[in-house]
A protein has these predicted regions:
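Extracellular domains of the immunoglobulin superfamily
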Residues: 1-102
Length: 102
C-alpha cells in the first residue's frame, strides 16, 4: 500500500512531513517524519520495517509505503507538516482511509 501527500502553498523543503495513523475509536499514533530537503527520516520504532517514507521534490509529494499490510494497518492515515524549529503539526491533510481485508 502506498499513500501520497501532495504539498501546496508553501516551501516543501522547509518543513518536515509527518505521517499519523488513527484506527477507529482510537487516538492518533505518530508514524514518523521526513525532511524533503535531504530525505532525513525519523521513524517511530514501532513502525520500523512497516512504513517507508520517501519524497519526490519535483512533484512536491511525500509518500508512505506500508509493507505486508494486515488488518492491523486498517486505519485513516494523515500527513501533516511541521516546522523544523518546534515540530508542531500545524497543517494536516484530509486523511486517507485504508482497509485491509483479513
Amino acid at each position: 500500500v502506498q499513500l501520497s501527500c501532495k504539498a501546496s502553498g508553501y516551501s516543501f523543503t522547509s518543513y518536515w512531513m509527518n505521517w499519523v495513523k488513527q484506527r477507529p475509536g482510537q487516538g492518533l499514533e505518530w508514524i514518523g517524519m521526513i525532511h524533503p530537503s535531504d530525505s532525513e527520516t525519523r521513524l517511530n520504532q514501532k513502525f520500523k520495517g512497516k512504513a517507508t517514507l520517501t519524497v519526490d521534490k519535483s512533484s512536491i509529494t511525500a509518500y508512505m509505503q506500508l509493507t505486508s499490510p494486515t488488518s492491523e494497518d486498517s486505519a485513516v492515515y494523515y500527513c501533516a507538516r511541521a516546522p523544523a524549529y518546534d515540530y508542531t503539526l500545524d497543517y494536516w491533510g484530509q486523511g486517507t482511509s485504508v482497509t485491509v481485508s483479513s
